Amino acid sequence: MAKKSKIVKDQKQRELVLKYSKLRLELKKKADYAGLSQIPAKASPVRLKNRDSIDGRPRGYIRKFGISRINFRQLAHQGKLPGVRKTSW
């Protein structure tokens, strides 16, 4: 599990990206790069790091579910992920 501070930092950064998303889009359409430079750099969605929504793990992230491979496996075995079935071949 990641440190609580990392999880909180990630949540705050995601809120910041949402807050400035409309403004960034408008400034990009106008090609107002001077205005874009006035927005905080952390408000750019490119700077987001994918982290597990449950425990904040930064590696082994599965985008479709928003969780790490470890939590994916646990939840899949418990049957808590709809549409996920164990396969064998």
UniProtKB/Swiss-Prot annotation:
It comes from Aster yellows witches'-broom phytoplasma (strain AYWB). Part of the 30S ribosomal subunit. Contacts proteins S3 and S10. Belongs to the universal ribosomal protein uS14 family. Keywords: Ribonucleoprotein, Ribosomal protein, RNA-binding, rRNA-binding. The keyword rRNA-binding applies. The gene is rpsN. GO terms for biological process: translation. Pfam families: Ribosomal_S14. Binds 16S rRNA, required for the assembly of 30S particles and may also be responsible for determining the conformation of the 16S rRNA at the A site. GO terms for molecular function: rRNA binding; structural constituent of ribosome. One of its GO terms (cellular component) is cytoplasm. This is Small ribosomal subunit protein uS14. Gene3D superfamilies: 30s Ribosomal Protein S14, Chain N. The keyword Ribosomal protein applies. It comes from the Bacteria. InterPro entries: Ribosomal_uS14, Ribosomal_uS14_bac/plastid, Ribosomal_uS14_sf.
